[in-house]
Amino acid sequence: MSKSWRFEALDTLFFRDGTPFHQGETGNILPGSVFPPLMLTMQGAIRTALARKQGWIPDKKGLPEKLRLGTTDDLGDLQLAGPYLRFNGERLYPAPLTLFGNKNGKGDWTLTRLIPGPKVDCDLGEGVRLPKLQKQIDGELLNLWVTKEGMESILNFRFPEAKHLIEPDQLWKNEQKIGIMREEKTKVAKDKHLYSLIHIRPHAELEVEVEVGGIPEDWHLQKTQALPLGGEGRFALVNVSDITDPLPRMPELTVSHDGQIRFTVTLLTPGYYQDMNQVVKEGPPQIPGTCVSASIGKAMHMGGWNLKENKPRPIKPLLPPGSTWFFEAKADQLAEIKGVHGSFKGEKTAYGMGQLIVGIWKEEWED
């Protein structure tokens, strides 16, 4: 049975992005943090905690095979979903990258949405339907977090209430830190070897949540523990409990007058795919119907540190949560569409990557 592991930062956290540390060159680009952290970071903390509970002591040989906790590249029996964010005890979701608008000084939102536009010929091909604004307003594509109720409104092609919209700076802040290099053997600070980087300081009520399954019930942590998490020697408190948050409900899918079911698929977690270009144009694999348009966020980068070989991991691109594709399908594909909601598509799905939820969209003439 899967359990919810909830990580609460004890101080700042550091989950390094792909930016290299300076080697004497000029410039103000600092190594930053990816937040929420990628599962490659979370799985290391979780697997280590599980192994320690079974009596394993860290050594250079890695985890014993008998524990069946896998490796960084193959999780064995372990099954993970997430990471998700929880704020004030409520799970949050990345808003689909279809919301567009602005917020005035009083805190009121003016919103519209992206929908597929008319066919055009462009560098992507002939007859491409690029996304357009449903209503012309000032603003920008919104990078927000939403509650379950807010997500259900968006999936139903409605606008969420303001109380269900949370901006990132309400959840965490970036904080610049200064460090100094030390000699590996003596631990003595090296003169003129200062470095700067960006940490994350989460709100006191913010937690990072991972669903952990595929292991015996009594392997889960039984009490609150402090575990190393991320880089720079940072720690987080971990609580394990039953999973209490089902996914946002899928809206009712209907067949339009022209015989088409119009639906969207949105990434809840980063997506990793072998053929990224094809996925951008045609949508994630194994989705019924035809992709007619998409709103995709800026690519993320997955890297990290290879502890076994003591070197950085190769940087690989990911599609960010919130990326949304617009699909059309035939009426007889209804059951297949329903099966997409909450499923994982693409590569590294055992790591929680590529989780999708289904919504609906309408042509302008359907309103």
Which sequence ranges carry the predicted segments?
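Conserved active-site/ligand-binding neighborhood in enzyme cores
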Residues: 1-367
